[in-house]
């Protein structure tokens, strides 16, 4: 999450996922080397067909902490998306699980720039300056497990981890940069 002091907005990568937890002793058994959360994802798959269970969603939301109002929101194809970076120039950056690194207008959420990077991103971007030139960098890759659970949370065919694999790498961008991203 990031904050723009000029606009007074907080940019939140939301992960809205319902989970079914069963408080029955012995129901869940720990399995070494697997995604041990205390829930059974196949039960969650079944729950997705039940009425009253909200859909799994992910978005970037611009939130006003003083009024409690969401000023704008951009929905993503999957819930597991990266952190955000907001700059003094009014741009908010975020990488998403579809493999796109996106620059949004911090005031209204308009997409200003987007780059396909062939892997999902969960890390927040950073910015730095060298010899008066500003760069934005992101550690790309699905270091967490959220994008590796596929069908259990839907939209599995639209996530970069399924389309390209999960190659981690550091990417750095600058205005006017000419380098081409190598294909993985």
State where each predicted segment sits.
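Long, low-complexity segments enriched in small/aliphatic residues
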Residues: 2-19
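Extracytoplasmic/lumenal domain signature
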Residues: 21-79, 85-88, 92-122, 126-184
């Amino acid at each position: 999450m990031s904050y723009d002091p000029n606009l007074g907005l907080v940019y939140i990568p939301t992960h809205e996922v319902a989970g079914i937890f069963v408080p029955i002793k012995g129901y869940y058994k720990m399995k070494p080397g697997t995604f041990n959360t205390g829930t059974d994802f196949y039960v969650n798959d079944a729950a997705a067909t039940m009425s009253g269970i909200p859909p799994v969603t992910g978005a970037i939301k611009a939130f006003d902490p003083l009024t409690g109002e969401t000023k704008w929101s951009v929905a993503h194809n999957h819930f597991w998306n990266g952190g955000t970076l907001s700059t003094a120039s009014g741009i908010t950056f975020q990488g998403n699980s579809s493999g796109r690194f996106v620059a949004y207008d911090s005031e209204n959420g308009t997409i200003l720039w987007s780059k396909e990077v062939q892997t999902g991103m969960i890390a927040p971007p950073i910015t730095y300056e060298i010899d008066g030139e500003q760069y934005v960098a992101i550690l790309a890759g699905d270091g967490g497990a959220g994008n590796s659970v596929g069908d259990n949370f839907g939209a599995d065919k639209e996530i970069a981890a399924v389309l390209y694999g999960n190659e981690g790498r550091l990417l750095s961008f600058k205005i006017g940069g000419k380098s081409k991203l190598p294909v993985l």
